[in-house]
Amino acid sequence: MALLLLGAPLRAQDVPDEAHEARVNAIEMAHAFTDESFIVRDGFWRTRLAPNEEVVCALQLFAGVDYWICLGSGTPEAQLQMGLFTSAPRPVAVLERVQEPSRAAIKVRPRTSGLFYLKVRNNHGQAARVCVTYCYK
């Protein structure tokens, strides 16, 4: 029975696409922090980045709360970079940073509540689908 399943041909809907892989990588990165009592936010943002393109998305964050902002890509060779900025725009201090193939995360603790801007850049020579989510405590 197992041999029949392993030898079964894949249908188009069985093959995960790049957008799905980006979301899976972002969610897996966020879930890595649940052991530290972080709660994964039920929501995400995703887009496609051209080579050397950067995009900005807005996040509502609150003072004194710890956040892990997690980024995933469906492109294994992706070279992603991210930073968080206030509306001033001033960079928010990054407490910790994790960088892995296809995913990354930054830990921040904003001093004030408000709208913050996450800048994501694709430093790779190929387009990449990316997905962002975050967890907090």
What are these regions (language model features)?
Residues A8-A12:
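Sec/Tat signal peptide C-region and signal peptidase I cleavage site
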Residues Q13-D17, G43-R129, C135-K137:
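Acidic, Ser/Thr/Pro-rich low-complexity intrinsically disordered segments
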Residues M1-G7:
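Bacterial N-terminal signal peptides
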Residues Q13-F38:
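Predominantly extracellular/luminal regions of secreted and cell-surface proteins
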Residues L5, I39-V40:
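Short Pro/Gly-enriched beta-strand edge/turn motifs at strand-loop
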